[in-house]
């Protein structure tokens, strides 16, 4: 399961980020896209895009994909810059606010790294899904990164 978001130049609200209202899902060899993207379509992906843009306004595209350790190994082998966060370190006041975790985790990872990396991941937590976020300047460079990850991963699992 994944989603994709892209922020307008100088985006600062949910409605400035286009995303899919429902997740993109792999079904066998097919990919199901249950709806067309729209501005304000995904609060979760928009929170990540907007937080990233606060640190580097040129990075406007994000795709989240389900975490697994082999994907992290692939990202390392591709020499993608990476940062992570541990949801156990999340302050309680953030944890109880719906939607605040993604902003906190994204900002935490970027601050720890010192710049916006290609990849931000976490291993989840109680009722929190583990996730990898691929970050890029635009949709084309995002697609390029994701396809490289997919191609290398496909060779790994054959």
What does each model-identified segment do?
Residues 1-158:
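Conserved mixed alpha/beta catalytic, RNA-binding, or beta-rich assembly cores of soluble enzyme
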């Amino acid at each position: 399961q994944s989603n994709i978001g892209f922020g307008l130049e100088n985006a600062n609200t949910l409605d400035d980020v286009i995303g899919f209202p429902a997740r993109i899902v792999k079904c066998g060899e097919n990919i199901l896209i249950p709806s067309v993207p729209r501005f304000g379509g995904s609060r979760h992906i928009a929170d990540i895009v907007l937080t990233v843009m606060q640190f580097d306004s040129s990075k406007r595209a994000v795709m989240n994909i389900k975490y697994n350790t082999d994907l992290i190994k692939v990202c390392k082998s591709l020499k993608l810059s990476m940062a992570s966060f541990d949801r156990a370190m999340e302050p309680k006041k953030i944890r109880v606010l719906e939607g605040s975790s993604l902003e906190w985790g994204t900002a935490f990872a970027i601050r720890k790294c010192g710049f916006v990396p290609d990849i931000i991941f976490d291993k989840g937590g109680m009722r929190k899904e583990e996730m990898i976020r691929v970050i890029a300047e635009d949709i084309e460079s995002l697609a390029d990164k994701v396809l490289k990850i997919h191609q290398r991963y496909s060779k790994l699992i054959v």
